[in-house]
């Protein structure tokens, strides 16, 4: 691990820290859920699309010692934040950054794993800050274009993992089906037992598979649920 401290205060996990003030993507529960849930045991080369602060890449690097990870983002400030976070992590030698539009970037190889926390504001209200808008608005990365690009970049037996709010996730899955993707895994997430499902975690592949479905409740009363703690305890400091 390189010596030194992060220049910017941020969010500290058990094995790494995230400085996020220069990026439109602060640490979110969505990102932590996806990074903890996605399964890349059989992958060798992972592509993190829209890396932001690098959270997903760092989580996957911590979980899978064999992974070589390429992280891309169109936003220069996000690249700066990710570079800082990567350089102070124990896995910096396996983390590679590329600045640019994933729809236009050229890669030397395809990937057997893709992870992405996609933008999901389709129209109407824009985020106030420009970087936040870039991170969350589909004007910069439409879902149909994202899925098509993932098809081009994924190996035949590879897997692509995403997280989206319920409505946007259902629409995304419809687009995926139209493009010939297969739903391998699906997790419906709700914030508490009496609240409706508000997030979808899902794994897509180009090969046929029987869909594995599960449910996750984040809070159980005034505390985190046992299932949420089991999923995220390797990352959050107070678990």
Swiss-Prot record:
Assigned GO CC terms: cytoplasm
InterPro entries: DNA_methylase_N6_adenine_CS, SAM-dependent_MTases_sf, Small_mtfrase_dom, tRNA_Adenine-N(6)_MTase, tRNA_adenine-N6_MeTrfase
Record GO biological process: methylation; tRNA processing
The enzyme's E.C. designation: 2.1.1.223
Keyword Zinc found: no
Molecular function as annotated in GO: nucleic acid binding; tRNA (adenine-N6)-methyltransferase activity
Cross-referenced Pfam families: MTS (PF05175)
Record has Thylakoid as a keyword: no
Disulfide bonds: none
Broad class of enzyme this protein falls into: transferase
Coiled coil start-end: none
Keywords, in A-Z order: Cytoplasm, Methyltransferase, S-adenosyl-L-methionine, Transferase, tRNA processing
Homology family: Belongs to the methyltransferase superfamily. tRNA (adenine-N(6)-)-methyltransferase family.
Protein name: tRNA1(Val) (adenine(37)-N6)-methyltransferase
Species per Swiss-Prot/TrEMBL record: Vibrio vulnificus (strain YJ016)
């Amino acid at each position: 691990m390189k010596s030194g401290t992060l220049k910017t205060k941020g969010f500290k996990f058990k094995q790494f820290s995230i400085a996020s003030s220069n990026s439109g993507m602060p640490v979110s529960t969505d990102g932590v859920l996806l990074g903890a849930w996605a399964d890349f045991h059989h992958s060798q080369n992972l592509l993190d699309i829209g890396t932001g602060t690098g959270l997903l890449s760092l989580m996957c690097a911590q979980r899978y010692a064999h992974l070589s990870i390429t992280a891309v983002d169109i936003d220069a400030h996000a690249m700066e934040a990710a570079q800082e976070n990567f350089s102070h992590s124990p896995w910096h030698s396996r983390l590679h950054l590329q600045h640019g539009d994933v729809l236009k970037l050229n890669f030397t190889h395809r990937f057997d794993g893709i992870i992405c926390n996609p933008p999901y504001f389709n129209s109407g209200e824009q985020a106030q800050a420009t970087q936040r808008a870039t991170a969350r608005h589909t004007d910069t990365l439409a879902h149909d274009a994202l899925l098509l690009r993932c098809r081009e970049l994924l190996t035949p037996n590879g897997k692509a993992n995403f997280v989206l709010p319920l409505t946007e996730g259902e629409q995304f899955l419809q687009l995926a089906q139209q493009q010939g993707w297969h739903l391998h895994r699906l997790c419906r997430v709700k914030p508490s037992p009496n609240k409706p499902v508000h997030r979808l975690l899902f794994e897509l592949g180009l090969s046929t598979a029987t869909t594995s479905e599960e449910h996750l409740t984040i809070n159980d009363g005034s505390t985190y649920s046992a299932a949420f703690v089991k999923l995220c305890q390797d990352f959050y400091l107070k678990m």
